[in-house]
């Protein structure tokens, strides 16, 4: 049972996946949203303002098998890995998530917090040299951010479904300033994939 937000869910899923239990497919966990970020819970229609709905899910054993992603990376000292349920970000997206997690209490709304964080980083539009291989397609060059999601996360992979066996990927190239403003607006409307500087996979 997880009572908390996305951070608590992330810690729990990593605890489960790194445990000594051989058959992890039979492990069930319940979520009662009670954190700054409850993005994954909200995908299922659960909200911290209505904890009774989450309790009803658990009592009635409403089960759904979900996808778990794994990210292998080098942390500067050693190669390691982390598991995730929602989304991971590379580049500027990771910085935005870092800031928005700190401002969520002030803004209250996840999309608004994310958008506000983007505004705070308007002039940090740093590009990252990358080599991506997605579905056999090699992408080399400088990009602003990459989002890999099994669910919608902060809205950069809005079409992702956490139980279809697929990961959605959004590659975001560096937009001009006016395009960044329109991108924030499209993010809030759930239409970010229509932005010409975003390439979805």
Describe the function of each predicted region.
Residues 133-140, 161-164, 171-201:
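ATP/nucleoside-binding phosphotransfer catalytic cores, i.e., glycine-rich phosphate-binding loops
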Residues 96-103, 167-176:
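Compositionally biased, charge-rich terminal segments
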Residues 4-5, 32, 173:
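Small/polar loops that bind or transfer phosphate-bearing groups
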Residues 92-95, 151-156, 176-179:
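Short, acidic Gly/Pro/Ser/Thr-rich loop/turn segments
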Residues 145-154, 160, 190-194:
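Phosphate-binding core of ATP-grasp and ATP-grasp-like enzymes
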Residues 1-25:
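N-terminal small/polar loop signature for handling phosphorylated ligands or for N-terminal nucleophile
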Residues 17-147:
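Catalytic core of DAGKc-family lipid kinases
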């Amino acid at each position: 049972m997880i009572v908390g937000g996305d951070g608590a869910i992330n810690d729990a899923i990593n605890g489960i996946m790194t445990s000594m239990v051989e058959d992890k497919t039979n492990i069930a966990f319940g979520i009662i949203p009670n954190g700054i970020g409850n993005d994954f819970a909200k995908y299922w229609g659960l909200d911290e303002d209505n904890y009774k709905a989450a309790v009803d899910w658990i009592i009635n054993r409403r089960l759904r098998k979900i996808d778990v992603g794994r990210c292998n990376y080098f942390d500067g000292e050693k190669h390691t890995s982390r598991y995730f349920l929602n989304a991971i970000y590379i580049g500027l997206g990771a910085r935005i998530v870092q800031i928005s997690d700190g401002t969520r209490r002030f803004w209250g709304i996840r999309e608004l917090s994310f958008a506000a964080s983007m505004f705070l980083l308007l002039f940090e539009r740093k590009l990252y040299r990358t080599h991506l291989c997605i579905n056999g397609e090699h992408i080399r060059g400088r990009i602003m951010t990459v989002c890999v999601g099994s669910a919608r996360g902060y809205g950069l992979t809005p079409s992702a479904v956490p139980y279809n066996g697929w990961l959605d990927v959004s590659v975001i190239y560096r937009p001009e300033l006016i395009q960044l403003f329109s991108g924030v607006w499209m993010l809030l409307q759930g239409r970010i994939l229509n932005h010409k500087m975003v390439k979805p996979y």
